[in-house]
């Protein structure tokens, strides 16, 4: 667990079910236009069905996408799937201000998920050869980050209660035959609402933040400054 970040708060925004592209653009805009005084943010979101290709993604790992769109992403890693019932958490932290290294952040994210699952009675672990969190040999959480101007964005995708079939259409994270699992298969009846507060609490504990301050989310708040009307707020929060 990191030293407590006394001087900086973190804002929590709940987005609900959203298409991938506009949320991704909003996240990029926030990162591009944030200032030294902008609070760090975490966004909880479920995405409509989409495959995303990371920067290292290879076309041969997209086997048969069918009617699910494939979108290029600038996060690290290979191809993965997002869909309803999967908890995505975008993590936008000023690493320079927090005096936090990228490896430290990755470890904190993995430990966040491991702690969340432990709270639900599920034993899991990280693997040095393949980022993410695993239950036995099955992957339950993917992660991918990008750092720009010393600030992180993108984050984690935790399988909670979803249709896992689309993972069969790809080589998840570039691994042929990688088996996926989810919380509801290991603890029946677990819902997104059960998981969200535990996940947020574990994350703030790992990074040493005070409790997250929940604020509403609106796409209009994350337009570039020159595209905002005078009545809209700036990207800085």
From Swiss-Prot:
What family does this chain come from, according to its entry?
Answer: Belongs to the LipB family.
Q: Which organism is it from?
A: Yersinia enterocolitica serotype O:8 / biotype 1B (strain NCTC 13174 / 8081)
Q: Does the keyword Acyltransferase apply?
A: yes
Q: Which UniProt keywords apply?
A: Acyltransferase, Cytoplasm, Transferase
| Superkingdom, taxonomy of origin | Bacteria
The listed locations are: Cytoplasm
**By its UniProt entry, which PROSITE patterns does this protein fall under?**
BPL_LPL_CATALYTIC, LIPB
Protein name according to UniProt = Octanoyltransferase
Which Gene3D superfamilies does the UniProt entry name for this protein? Bira Bifunctional Protein, Domain 2
CDD domains given in the database record: LipB (cd16444)
User: Mind naming one GO cellular-component term on file for this protein?
Assistant: cytoplasm
Q: Where is this site: Lowers pKa of active site Cys?
A: 139
Answer yes or no on keyword Magnesium. Answer: no
Active-site residues annotated for this sequence: 173
Identify the residues that bind substrate. Answer: 75-82, 142-144, 155-157
BPL/LPL catalytic domain ranges (all copies):
36-211
Q: In which pathway does it act?
A: Protein modification; protein lipoylation via endogenous pathway; protein N(6)-(lipoyl)lysine from octanoyl-[acyl-carrier-protein]: step 1/2
> What function does the entry list?
Catalyzes the transfer of endogenously produced octanoic acid from octanoyl-acyl-carrier-protein onto the lipoyl domains of lipoate-dependent enzymes. Lipoyl-ACP can also act as a substrate although octanoyl-ACP is likely to be the physiological substrate.
């Amino acid at each position: 667990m990191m030293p407590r970040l006394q001087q900086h708060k973190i804002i929590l925004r709940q987005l609900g079910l959203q298409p991938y592209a506009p949320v991704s653009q909003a996240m990029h805009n926030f990162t591009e236009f944030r200032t030294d005084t902008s609070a760090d943010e975490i966004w909880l979101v479920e995405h409509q069905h989409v495959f995303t290709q990371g920067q290292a993604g290879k076309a041969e790992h997209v086997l048969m996408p069918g009617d699910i769109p494939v979108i290029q992403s600038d996060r690290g890693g290979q191809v993965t799937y997002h869909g309803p019932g999967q908890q995505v958490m975008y993590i936008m932290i000023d690493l320079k201000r927090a005096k936090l290294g990228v490896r430290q952040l990755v470890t904190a994210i993995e430990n966040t998920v491991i702690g969340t699952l432990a709270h639900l009675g599920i034993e899991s672990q990280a693997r040095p050869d393949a980022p993410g969190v695993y239950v036995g040999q099955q992957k339950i959480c993917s992660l991918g980050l990008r750092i720009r101007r010393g600030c992180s964005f993108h984050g984690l995708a935790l399988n909670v209660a979803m249709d896992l079939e689309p993972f069969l259409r790809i080589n998840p994270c570039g691994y042929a035959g990688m088996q996926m699992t989810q919380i509801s298969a290991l603890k029946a009846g677990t819902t997104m609402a059960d998981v969200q507060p535990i996940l947020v609490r574990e994350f703030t504990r790992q990074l040493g933040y005070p409790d997250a301050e929940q604020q509403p989310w609106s796409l209009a708040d994350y337009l570039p400054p020159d595209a905002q009307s005078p009545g809209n707020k700036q990207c800085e929060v």
